[in-house]
Amino acid sequence: MERKIFCASGPNDVYRAVSTSLGRERFWATSAPESGGVISFVLADRRTAECRVEEAVQDELYRLQYFGRTLTFALAAGETGGTELTLSSSDPADGAEVVSLLLRLKASVDFGVDLRNHDETRTTSYADS
């Protein structure tokens, strides 16, 4: 399954958000350092996983194994600026999670806003965790 968004920010900014520890920690994970092509994710609900980066093409593509599924971020420069971003998941049931992730990413790169609630007691079924 896949979903798309348009970011006013350029491909380099969007790529850095998904491909760097600091970028991921601004909208996605409590902690997400990378070493040797493996990201150590810690999420707000305390789930953890060692996620292998499968492919990384600067400003174009970022693919990783993520909690038993494959996530692929495909970036393309917009015709008049910005970034066309497509997020694909190998799990067809990921619709809500993918939309939430994309909107948090857009808020972070375009507006510098973190939409997460940062409340460990509000994680299950919360779109903003």
Please provide the spans of the model-predicted regions.
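Short, surface-exposed coil-to-beta transition loops
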Residues: M1-E2, R47-C51, G68-T72
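Generic structural detector for well-ordered beta-strands
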Residues: K4-A8, S40-V42, R52, A74-A76
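Hydrophobic pocket/interface hotspot
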Residues: V14-V18, R24, I39, V53, ...
